[in-house]
């Protein structure tokens, strides 16, 4: 009888173990069963155009520890750190560049090792681990809540991420493996999160969150803007003439851009620029906001007002309000 009970207990424990791991590996699929993959694709393209990293993975794919370290160090531009000549990293299950990158990340506390000489690069990184790594890498610890003895509770990392806006639109999955869809959204939010600055006065250093100082501005010399596309290489809604090949106008400002954006004229967009260079642009227009007028139906344009014939053959007028760009 005892053997039967023992065998049943072992079977139950094994079942629970595999069930938990199956949920951990595939649980993210439930999160994204109704998700908008367009946003994920847009964010992946954004990071590629900014030259940060290329996350060529399905939205529901889970992130390994090695991939997380590589993406995080690229995000904060620490991936160019090289090991001294002849120095081999301590992890036996890694070699080459990945070995030193992992050792650097562990030394900074961005991720933990499993043992002194084992990193387990192919294991999944957990949501809480990823959040902690991002928060530490962005330098938030000086302004985080601490315990009475000065230590930082594990819960403070999630609290800081929430405070900084890194959790905006993110489904928090706690101790489960993080998916690419969730990780990319965390990185996207972290791009424009305000960073920590400090001032020295009276022999004392005070740390504070500095508005306007972000990863995007400080590390990539770029800026996120919003506007309306006023022209592409085919159409100019103000009648100022067509733009040049591979060109686009946003708020009537011309940008040379190698990609084709033929369907954005008149739409609200978010875009990223570095100096005068357009890095990436995408529509944030809602479908119900569209008024589509075929060019063949336009009868005239004067004083910022279009005269056109609608689908019922009636003459209509549509004005572009003053100050609307």
Set out the residue ranges of the language-model regions.
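Extracellular, beta-strand-rich glycan-interacting domains
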Residues: 187-189
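Low-complexity, Pro/Ser/Thr- and charge-rich linker/hinge segments at domain boundaries
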Residues: 288-299
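Cationic, glycine-rich low-complexity segments
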Residues: 42-43
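Beta-strand/loop nucleic-acid-binding surfaces
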Residues: 251-262, 315-325
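Short polybasic amphipathic segments
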Residues: 242-250, 303-311, 324
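Feature responds to low-complexity, polar/acidic, surface-exposed segments characteristic
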Residues: 2-39, 48-100, 107-128, 135-177, ...
């Amino acid at each position: 009888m005892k053997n039967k009970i023992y065998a049943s207990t072992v079977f139950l424990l094994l079942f629970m173990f595999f069930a938990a791991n199956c949920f951990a590996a595939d649980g993210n699929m439930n999160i994204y069963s109704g998700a908008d993959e367009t946003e994920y694709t847009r964010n992946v393209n954004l990071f590629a155009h900014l030259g940060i990293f290329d996350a060529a993975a399905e939205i529901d794919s889970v992130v390994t520890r090695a991939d997380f370290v590589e993406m995080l160090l690229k995000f904060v531009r620490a991936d160019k750190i090289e090991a001294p000549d002849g120095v081999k990293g301590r992890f036996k299950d890694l070699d080459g560049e990945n070995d030193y990158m992992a050792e650097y990340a562990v030394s900074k506390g961005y991720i933990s090792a499993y043992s002194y000489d084992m990193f387990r690069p192919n294991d999944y990184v957990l949501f809480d681990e990823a959040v902690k790594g991002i928060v530490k890498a962005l330098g938030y610890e000086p302004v985080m809540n601490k315990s009475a003895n000065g230590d930082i509770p594990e819960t403070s990392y999630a609290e800081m991420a929430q405070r900084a806006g890194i959790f905006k639109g993110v489904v928090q999955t706690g101790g489960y493996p993080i998916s690419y869809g969730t990780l990319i959204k965390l990185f996207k939010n972290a791009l424009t999160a305000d960073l920590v600055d400090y001032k020295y006065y009276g022999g004392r250093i005070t740390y504070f969150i500095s508005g306007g100082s972000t990863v995007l501005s400080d590390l990539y010399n770029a800026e996120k803007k919003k506007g309306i596309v006023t022209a592409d290489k085919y159409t100019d809604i103000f009648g100022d003439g067509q733009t040049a090949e591979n060109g686009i106008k946003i708020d009537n400002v011309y940008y040379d851009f190698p990609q084709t954006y033929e369907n954005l004229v008149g739409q609200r967009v978010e875009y990223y620029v570095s100096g005068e260079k357009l890095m990436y642009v995408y529509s944030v227009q809602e479908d119900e906001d569209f008024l589509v007028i075929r060019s063949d139906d336009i009868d005239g344009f004067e004083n910022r007002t279009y005269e056109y014939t609608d689908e019922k053959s009636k003459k209509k007028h549509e004005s572009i309000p003053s100050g609307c760009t």
